[in-house]
Amino acid sequence: MEFITYEVEGMVGIITINRPKALNALNSQVLEELDATLDAVDQNAVRCLILTGAGEKSFVAGADIGEMSTLTKAEGEAFGKKGNDVFRKLETFPLPVIAAVNGFALGG
């Protein structure tokens, strides 16, 4: 994976969004990788997840506006649906998920 890292420390799974040059903005690839990472978590090996962003400037700067400006209407709708699906998966994940917010936490 290019933009998501996952590591286990003891009984804690740590997911890091790793696009610090783009302030960890969410693009299609980040959403796909985050979705796949959540699916791959061994829920018997960890007791909780920490979600954080790489670097000190930004946790997540919202959606990647650069990518969004290139999408067709249908692609934009699919991007929005994918984002909603991934966020719903985080909200309903069977383990506690802690957001370790470092820097900006923006929506959009």
Residue ranges and their predicted role:
Residues 53-89, 105:
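Glycine- (often His-adjacent) and acidic-residue-rich active-site loop
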Residues 3, 21, 25, 32, ...:
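Residues at secondary-structure transition points
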Residues 89-108:
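Glycine-rich beta-to-alpha active-site loop
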Residues 44-45, 71, 93:
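Structured helix-beta-strand junction loops
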Residues 26, 65, 101:
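Hydrophobic pocket-lining residues within nucleotide cofactor-binding pockets
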Residues 18, 63, 102:
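Histidine-centered beta-alpha loop that forms part of the nucleotide-sugar donor binding/catalytic region
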Residues 1-52, 88:
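Conserved CoA-thioester-binding segment of acyl-CoA-metabolizing enzymes
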